[in-house]
C-alpha cells in the first residue's frame, strides 16, 4: 500500500470540551503520524471558502456559523490508506449512525457539532491540506 496524507479538523465543540489530546491519542494508536498541526479560529471568509462546495445547501449557513464559533485544530495525518482509515475512525457524519468507539460516537454533540472533519478522497485531502498549510509546515517523519 501507498502512504497517503489526509486532512483532519477537530471542530469547535471538541476543542471546547478539551478532547484534543484524546482524539490525537486515537489517531496515534491507529497508526497515524501527525505531521502538521495548528490551532486557529476561522474567519467567516475562511469557513465559506473551505466549505464552498456546500454553498446553497440548507445546512451551509449553520455550518459556517458553527465552524467560526470557536477555535479549531487542523492537522495533516500520514499513514497507509490514510483517507479511508481516518474516515473509518471518524464514523458516520451523523453521530446517531456512528458505530460505538468511533470519534463521532464518542465526541460529537450533534449532526453539525460532530467533533471532526476528514477528507473524503486523496484529491480533496491535497486541496484541504493546501488550504491551511504550506509545505514548510509539514514534517514527514
Swiss-Prot record:
It catalyses: a 2'-deoxyribonucleoside 5'-diphosphate + ATP = a 2'-deoxyribonucleoside 5'-triphosphate + ADP; a ribonucleoside 5'-diphosphate + ATP = a ribonucleoside 5'-triphosphate + ADP. It comes from the Bacteria. Gene3D superfamilies: Nucleoside diphosphate kinase-like domain. PROSITE patterns: NDPK, NDPK_LIKE. InterPro entries: NDK-like_dom (IPR034907), NDK-like_dom_sf (IPR036850), Nucleoside_diP_kinase (IPR001564), Nucleoside_diP_kinase_AS (IPR023005). GO terms for cellular component: cytoplasm. It is found in: Cytoplasm. It holds the Pfam family NDK. GO terms for biological process: CTP biosynthetic process; GTP biosynthetic process; UTP biosynthetic process. ATP binds at residues 11, 59, 87, 93, 104, 114. The active site is at 117 (pros-phosphohistidine intermediate). Belongs to the NDK family. Major role in the synthesis of nucleoside triphosphates other than ATP. The ATP gamma phosphate is transferred to the NDP beta phosphate via a ping-pong mechanism, using a phosphorylated active-site intermediate. This is Nucleoside diphosphate kinase.
Amino acid at each position: 500500500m501507498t502512504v497517503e496524507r489526509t486532512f483532519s479538523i477537530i471542530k469547535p465543540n471538541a476543542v471546547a470540551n478539551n478532547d484534543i489530546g484524546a482524539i490525537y491519542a486515537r489517531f496515534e494508536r491507529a497508526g497515524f503520524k501527525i505531521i502538521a498541526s495548528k490551532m486557529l479560529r476561522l474567519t467567516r471568509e475562511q469557513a465559506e471558502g473551505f466549505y464552498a462546495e456546500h454553498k446553497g445547501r440548507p445546512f451551509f449557513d449553520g455550518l459556517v456559523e458553527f465552524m467560526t464559533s470557536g477555535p479549531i485544530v487542523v492537522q495533516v495525518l500520514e499513514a497507509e490508506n490514510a483517507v479511508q482509515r481516518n474516515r473509518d475512525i471518524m464514523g458516520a457524519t451523523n453521530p446517531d449512525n456512528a458505530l460505538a468507539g468511533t470519534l463521532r460516537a464518542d465526541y460529537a454533540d450533534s449532526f453539525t457539532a460532530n467533533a471532526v472533519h476528514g477528507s473524503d478522497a486523496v484529491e480533496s485531502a491535497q486541496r484541504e491540506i493546501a488550504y491551511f498549510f504550506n509545505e514548510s509546515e509539514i514534517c514527514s517523519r
